[in-house]
């Protein structure tokens, strides 16, 4: 990540993931490996062709808190952005996610996006529970707002999940929906 070269294609995690929480204040647990669940692939819910834009987003709950403040991105920032969203370890419900997405539509940003990337839900939820988030994304984005061409990828390895990839805010990225590839096409750092 600290290279001036573009990051390149990001591949789904194949090593597994965990919801196990250890008390890191206990020195004995600091070296203990957590139990991993089998890897689950990213889910490409909709979209065709290739889209490019800047990475913009973060924790859904925090973004919702920022709406209406000076820290909320300017309207122009949403144009063609690849919005990445993830939920916190508090595991907000799919209904909450739907309400926030509807609010994003009401403030005029949802229909400006190039794509939606959704991280594996945070908290200690079972993998079967993750599908409800896919359904609410489809319901709001596709059925309610008619954005059936907006690429949506879910179950990605970022956010309040372990292990997690880091998405550099504001850099250019590309989705190839036909090849199911996610590429960060710009370096997150500049040479001095």
Segments from the language model and where they lie:
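Oxyanion-binding "anion nests"
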Residues: 54-96
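Generic secondary-structure signature for well-ordered alpha-helical cores
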Residues: 2-11, 65-68, 72, 106-109, ...
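Short acidic (Asp/Glu) and glycine-rich catalytic loops that position anionic groups and cofactors
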Residues: 38-44, 79-81, 115-120
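Short low-complexity stretches enriched in small and charged residues
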Residues: 34-44, 69-76, 127-131, 137-141
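C-terminal active-site/capping subdomain that shapes the small-molecule cofactor and substrate pocket
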Residues: 91-192
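Glycine-rich, charged/polar anion/phosphate-binding loops
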Residues: 49-50, 66-71, 100-103, 159
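Conserved anion/nucleotide-ligand pocket segment
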Residues: 1-60
């Amino acid at each position: 990540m600290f290279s001036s070269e573009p990051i390149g294609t990001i591949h789904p995690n194949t090593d597994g993931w965990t919801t196990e929480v250890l008390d890191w204040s206990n020195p004995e647990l600091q070296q203990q490996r957590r139990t991993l669940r089998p890897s689950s692939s990213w889910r490409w819910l909709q979209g065709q062709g290739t889209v490019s834009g800047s990475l913009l987003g973060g924790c859904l709950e925090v973004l919702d808190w920022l709406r209406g403040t000076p820290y909320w991105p300017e309207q122009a920032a949403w144009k063609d952005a690849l919005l990445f969203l993830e939920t916190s370890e508090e595991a907000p419900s799919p209904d909450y996610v739907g309400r926030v997405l509807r609010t994003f539509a009401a403030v005029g940003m949802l229909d400006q996006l190039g794509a939606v990337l959704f991280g594996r839900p945070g908290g200690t939820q079972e993998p079967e529970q993750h599908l409800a988030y896919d359904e609410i994304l489809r319901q709001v984005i596709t059925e309610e707002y008619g954005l059936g061409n907006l690429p949506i990828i879910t179950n990605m390895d970022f956010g309040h999940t372990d292990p997690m990839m880091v998405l550099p805010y504001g850099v250019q990225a590309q989705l190839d929906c036909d090849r199911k590839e996610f590429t960060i096409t710009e370096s997150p750092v500049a040479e001095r």
